[in-house]
């Protein structure tokens, strides 16, 4: 089983149930945010350049709380989610896209 969200560049990004369980295992505070992971890919406030070719979709939750979803676009028609987490830190030097 899996769900798919479309990135800001129009690339379908997969979230398998196995990957979701892995994410929740390492970030239990994200456990109730399955739909928000997909929504963050589809409607981010901004996207950051991550490490080793990854992208990070970001949604703001409150004044200094950000929801980060790390993903990789393998091709123009395929990608997958790596992890998701909350943070209070945001490195604005790596912004590649911002919601208009």
Where are these regions (language model features)?
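Ribonuclease/tRNase effector modules and their secretory precursors
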Residues: 1-100
């Amino acid at each position: 089983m899996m769900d798919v969200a479309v990135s800001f560049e129009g690339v379908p990004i997969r979230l398998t149930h196995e990957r979701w369980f892995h994410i929740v295992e390492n970030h239990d505070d994200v456990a109730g945010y399955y739909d928000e992971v997909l929504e963050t890919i589809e409607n981010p406030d901004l996207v950051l350049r991550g490490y080793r070719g990854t992208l990070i979709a970001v949604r703001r939750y409150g004044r200094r709380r950000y929801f980060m979803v790390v993903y990789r676009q393998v091709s123009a028609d395929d990608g997958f989610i790596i992890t998701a987490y909350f943070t209070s830190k945001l490195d604005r030097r790596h912004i590649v896209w911002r919601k208009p």
